[in-house]
Amino acid sequence: HPVDRRQRQMCIRDSADIIIEKEFETAAVHQGYLETHACLVSVSPDDRTTIWSSSQGQFMVRAMTSFITGIPQSSIRAIPAEIGGGFGGKTIVYLEPVATILSKKSGRPVKMVMTREEVMRASGPTSGSKSKVKIGAKNNGKITAAQGTFYLQAGAFPGAPIRGAAGCCLAPYDIPNAHTFGYDVVSNRSKVAAYRAPGAPIG
């Protein structure tokens, strides 16, 4: 049930012998994988499509390519290639639908490889963040109450991994009174993408 701010503060203060408050910040960093996004696509005259891709999610590649091109998923075979690093950054589909359309039009296999500059412009880093944590505990070390507030930088569009941060921060502990708050902060920068369990390390 909802608890107002004053009640939360009283809950921490009244249940604890000691209260610790800390603030943490993380920078927005790109996944920095060694090899850039790449794919090779071959479409036969009957729309049988084979995709070799360095994606981390072949089922997403197949589904998104089908959605964009209109080719049934049953006619698309997505084969994973060596990833060359990904860390979450290669879960988003960029090249494969485009290469599929070009292969279908040309009747020839099409290979597409992003340059490093294209990767930095098209993909996204993880969110920068600011976190405020307040924890109350007894003298014997038992945590009695905690509150976490997370501000995650989302870029030009909402979509920062708030759930990961707010959901993971207090998860390892059995805390009788715990509250987390997450804010998806839109800012003048590129969109964000997954990076190593999105949001969880921030929490």
Description of each model-found segment:
Residues 39-106, 152, 160-170, 194-203:
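Alpha-helical support elements that line or immediately flank enzyme active sites
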Residues 16-29, 112-119:
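Short Pro/Gly-enriched beta-strand edge/turn motifs at strand-loop
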Residues 18-22, 33, 40-43:
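Active-site cores of enzymes that catalyze phosphoryl transfer or operate on phosphate-rich substrates
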Residues 1-12:
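Single conserved hydrophobic/aromatic residue that forms the stacking wall/gate
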Residues 31-35, 125-127:
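A short catalytic or substrate-binding loop motif that flags glycine-/basic-rich loops and adjacent residues
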Residues 5-6, 22, 60-66, 71, ...:
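Gly/Pro-rich active-site capping loops and adjacent beta-alpha segments
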Residues 17-19, 39, 48-50, 74-77, ...:
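Structural motif
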Residues 35-40, 130-132:
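Short glycine-rich loop/turn motifs
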